[in-house]
Amino acid sequence: MDFWKFFPFLALSSMWVLCLASSLQAAPFRSALESSLDLGTLSDQEKHLLLAALIQDYEQKARKLEQEEQETEGSRKGSSSSVISQKRSCNTATCVTHRLAGLLRRSGGVVKDNFVPTNVGSKAFGRRRRDLRV
């Protein structure tokens, strides 16, 4: 009995899906190497502007890398007695947890001085005392 209530809905929905599928067309695939920018159609002024923008972007990236290298060299000279190993960064929960644990370990007594342990014993506040003599 339930099948006859469900059958018209099933038939109409399948017809609707078929109509939608027939009206849709797949977009043509364009490879990453194929570009809409054709250098043959650019004017000389556009080519010069494009080249200037590419050079400016390259110079900005080179300056940024140079500043990062100087910062790392400065930090290495400041702490010449310790060797710093740099690893690839990872953003999974395990990696973040390990990084935070390392940060806490390196911070030393700063966290330990301000940390007050919680009272979690058998005689802790809020625990009910059980009488074994019933």
Swiss-Prot record:
Compositional bias ranges of the Low complexity kind: 77-89
Disulphides: C90-C95
Secreted is among the record's keywords: yes
PROSITE patterns tied to this protein: CALCITONIN
Region of interest (Disordered), residue spans: 65-91
Cited Pfam families: Calc_CGRP_IAPP
Modified residues (Phenylalanine amide): F125
Signal sequence, start to end: 1-26
Protein name in the entry: Calcitonin gene-related peptide 2
Gene: Calcb
Predominant subcellular localization, coarse grouping: secreted
Family label: Belongs to the calcitonin family.
Keywords: Amidation, Cleavage on pair of basic residues, Disulfide bond, Hormone, Secreted, Signal
Propeptide part(s) removed at maturation, as residue ranges: 27-86, 131-134
Annotated GO CC locations: extracellular space
InterPro entries: Calcitonin-like (IPR021117), Calcitonin/adrenomedullin (IPR021116), Calcitonin_CS (IPR018360), Calcitonin_gene-rel_peptide (IPR015476), Calcitonin_peptide-like (IPR001693)
Record's function text: CALCB/CGRP2 is a peptide hormone that induces vasodilation mediated by the CALCRL-RAMP1 receptor complex. Dilates a variety of vessels including the coronary, cerebral and systemic vasculature. Its abundance in the CNS also points toward a neurotransmitter or neuromodulator role.
Natural source organism: Rattus norvegicus
One GO biological process term: calcitonin gene-related peptide receptor signaling pathway
Localisation per UniProt entry: Secreted
GO molecular function, one term: hormone activity
